[in-house]
């Protein structure tokens, strides 16, 4: 190949010229895409790159007499060591100009990182070079990569064994590097706490810190944050913030339940991988599910105490980002559906911060994870049942008792039907208190309400819990749950719903409103209706909406007297899955048959059209032939006349 041009130089000086000379020539000839340097410049961080002179690799490529050593000149040992050192820092392979600049910057960043420069010569003298350094990577004329060994002059297609071993070593070294920065660890935690509201993105934050973290390349930063979020960052940060509560506003990765009451500060043990990325919202400002400063009103603290009694149980279930239910009594009922929601954290007093869950993108990202958790943890509890419990819990008394039942039993062990019947009894007793029965479901019954717990700016003590249940338009409650309308319908099983609805109606007088409610529970896909419920967060007029949406099933009092659900029970509540599957299959088959039939007709039409076109072409050809023959007849006639005249 091209190797013969440099062969004489290489013979005289075995090791050095082969290194300093032949490969730069080769790299000039083909801009070699050498061994990917992302691993290399991570690897350099492990070596103490304390070389006082910057690695001028571009010089070695030039033809200056100091660097292009000829055969006759001897080499001073210092130069030899220097090129060895530069070579070793490169990882021996990156010679293309793009990677030169890449390595150059990485080396400069790691230069300040060294403990003492005297380590380096000893290292190079211990291991003069790696056997993997002899290999370099090139592109053949056909465009494939091949690997060339400059010592044995062997070229091969597959990646050499030495390179694979070295990559393995570098990976192990990187793992050690990632876990061996205690100073950086503490510093990053403090920086992230201090700049929680100043809008740094996490990468920028770590880059600007003046400690050793500034020396890490970006990809290692992302790795450390990913590794260490699980290992140390969360527990440490929590203990830190609990010991000095007023010092920092709030840390971007910790999601505290806003409980000023006595909640045990047990750290998170599990946390999803994608959560650190989401901890910055559109402004990069602060945490994802930041909750309001809790009201110090008495009812709120009651519910908090109940939460803290059962707070230890859900910790074992928590798999995803715990978007905790706000403790100010806004929707405490959304704590039981998410078993991840009640994870207790150290009580952190929070400065009043505007709600940040209004970003629909974040909600859209969070929703699948939370739904998956709900299905994992509460596989035995249907979402529709939780809905019905929330729908039935109308008044303050029934709400309090049901929350207490939920929280004492724990999310795995509640008996839904008994709860519903009790709630229905309570609601019939408290029915004269003129509260709209559907108003509670405006925010709590929607199965998505735990994705966006309605976030309020801090409320004064004067707001009791009862108005929050009937949700009058309190001025300080922004509507946050509106972006959720885009989500699809949540699966409900239509089988168990009518039974629970019947239990309700066994205890209640049969009124159009209760029928409405049961019909809303029976509707198999509560897509738009439920979301319209949840979107009217600050609205007390939910019942008129529902009546307009489901006006089909309202009975006049005269008819209601003659109406008995027992007579139609046998046609209610059949499992619709089978019928739905059949219907969808038949619809698809009909659609396919129709498309096949239409395509056949289309091909026939095209065929006929082409036949017509062929006929037209043939007709024009015949016309042309007729015209041509007529022309020839005329000419022959003329010639005949001339001949007869000549004769």
UniProtKB/Swiss-Prot annotation:
Renumbered to this chain, the Basic residues biased-composition regions fall at 76-86
- Biased composition (Polar residues) is annotated at 23-37, 211-225, 317-331, 428-463, 489-503
Q: Which PANTHER family match?
A: WW DOMAIN-CONTAINING ADAPTER PROTEIN WITH COILED-COIL (PTHR15911:SF6)
The post-translation modification note in this UniProt entry reads: Phosphorylated on tyrosine residues.
Its assembly, as annotated, is: Interacts (via coiled coil domain) with RNF20, RNF40 and UBE2A. Interacts (via WW domain) with RNA polymerase II. Interacts with MTOR and other components of the MTOR pathway including RPTOR, RUVBL1, RUVBL2, TTI1 and TTI2.
Coiled-coil portions: 618-644
The organism's lineage is: Eukaryota, Metazoa, Chordata, Craniata, Vertebrata
Q: Which residues form the WW domain?
A: 129-162
Residue positions where Phosphothreonine is found in the record? 293, 471
Stretches of Low complexity bias are at 103-122, 252-267, 286-297, 332-345, 511-541
**Designated name of the protein:** WW domain-containing adapter protein with coiled-coil
A GO CC term assigned to this protein in UniProt: nucleus
Q: Which UniProt keywords apply?
A: Acetylation, Chromatin regulator, Coiled coil, Nucleus, Phosphoprotein, Transcription, Transcription regulation
**Clinical disorder:** DeSanto-Shinawi syndrome: An autosomal dominant syndrome characterized by developmental delay, hypotonia, behavioral problems, eye abnormalities, constipation, feeding difficulties, seizures and sleep problems. Patients exhibit dysmorphic features, including broad/prominent forehead, synophrys and/or bushy eyebrows, depressed nasal bridge and bulbous nasal tip. Additional variable features are posteriorly rotated ears, hirsutism, deep-set eyes, thin upper lip, inverted nipples, hearing loss and branchial cleft anomalies.
Where are residues bearing Phosphoserine located in the sequence?
53, 131, 142, 225, 446, 511, 523, 525
């Amino acid at each position: 190949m091209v190797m013969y041009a440099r062969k004489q130089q290489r013979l005289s000086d075995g090791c050095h010229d082969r290194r300093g000379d032949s490969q730069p020539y080769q790299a000039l000839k083909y801009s070699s895409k050498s061994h990917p340097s992302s691993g290399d410049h991570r690897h350099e961080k492990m070596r103490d790159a304390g070389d006082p002179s910057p690695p001028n690799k571009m010089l070695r490529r030039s033809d200056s007499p100091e660097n292009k050593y000829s055969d006759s000149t001897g080499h001073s040992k210092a130069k030899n060591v220097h090129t060895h050192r530069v070579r070793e820092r490169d990882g021996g392979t990156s010679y293309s100009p793009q990677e030169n600049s890449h390595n150059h910057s990485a080396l400069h960043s790691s230069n300040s990182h060294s403990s003492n420069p005297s380590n380096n010569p000893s290292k190079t003298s211990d291991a003069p070079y790696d056997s993997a350094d002899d290999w370099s990577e090139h592109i053949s004329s056909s465009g494939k990569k091949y690997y060339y060994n400059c010592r044995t002059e062997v070229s091969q297609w597959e990646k050499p064994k030495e390179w694979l071993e070295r990559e393995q070593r570098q990976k192990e070294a990187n793992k050690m590097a990632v876990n061996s920065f205690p100073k950086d660890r503490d510093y990053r935690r403090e920086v992230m706490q201090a700049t929680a509201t100043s809008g740094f993105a996490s990468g920028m934050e770590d880059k600007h810190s003046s400690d050793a973290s500034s020396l890490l390349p970006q990809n290692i930063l992302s790795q450390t944050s990913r590794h260490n979020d699980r290992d140390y960052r969360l527990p440490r940060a929590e203990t830190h913030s609990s010991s000095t509560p007023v010092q920092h506003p709030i840390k971007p990765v910790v999601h505290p339940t806003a409980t000023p009451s006595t909640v045990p500060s047990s750290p998170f043990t599990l946390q999803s991988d994608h959560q650190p990325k989401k901890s910055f919202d559109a402004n990069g400002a602060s945490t994802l599910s930041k909750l309001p400063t809790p009201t110090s009103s008495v009812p709120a603290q009651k519910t908090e105490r109940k939460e803290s009694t059962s707070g230890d149980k859900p910790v074992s279930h928590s798999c995803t980002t715990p978007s905790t239910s706000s403790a100010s009594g806004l929707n405490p009922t959304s704590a039981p559906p998410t078993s991840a929601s009640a994870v207790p954290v150290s009580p952190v007093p929070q400065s009043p911060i505007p709600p940040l869950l209004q970003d629909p993108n974040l909600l859209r990202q969070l929703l699948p994870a939370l739904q998956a958790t709900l299905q994992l943890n509460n596989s035995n509890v249907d979402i529709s049942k939780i809905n019905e419990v929330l729908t039935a819990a109308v008044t303050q008394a029934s709400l309090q008792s049901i929350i207490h039942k939920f929280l004492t039993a724990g999310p795995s062990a509640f008996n839904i039907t008994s709860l519903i019947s009790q709630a229905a009894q309570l609601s019939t007793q408290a029915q004269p208190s003129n509260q709209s029965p559907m108003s509670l479901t405006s925010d709590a019954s929607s199965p998505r309400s735990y994705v966006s717990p309605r976030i309020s700016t801090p409320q004064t003590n004067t707001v009791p819990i009862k108005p929050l249940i009937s949700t009058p338009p309190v001025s300080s409650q922004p509507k946050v749950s509106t972006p959720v309308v885009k989500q699809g319908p949540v699966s409900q099983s239509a089988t168990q719903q009518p039974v629970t609805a019947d239990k309700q109606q066994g205890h209640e007088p049969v009124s159009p409103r209760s029928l409405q409610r049961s019909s809303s529970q029976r509707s198999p896909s509560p897509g738009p209706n439920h979301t319209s419920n949840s979107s009217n967060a600050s609205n007390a007029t939910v019942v008129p909406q529902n009546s307009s949406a489901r006006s089909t099933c309202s009975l006049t009092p005269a008819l209601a007297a003659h109406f008995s659900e027992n007579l139609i029970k046998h046609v209610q509540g059949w499992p619709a899955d089978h019928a739905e599957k059949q219907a969808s299959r038949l619809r698809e088959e009909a659609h396919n048959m129709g498309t096949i039939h239409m395509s056949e007709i289309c091909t026939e039409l095209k065929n006929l059209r082409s036949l017509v076109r062929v006929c037209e072409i043939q007709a024009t050809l015949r016309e042309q032939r007729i015209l041509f023959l007529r022309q020839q007849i005329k000419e022959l006639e003329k010639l005949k006349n001339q001949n007869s005249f000549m004769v």
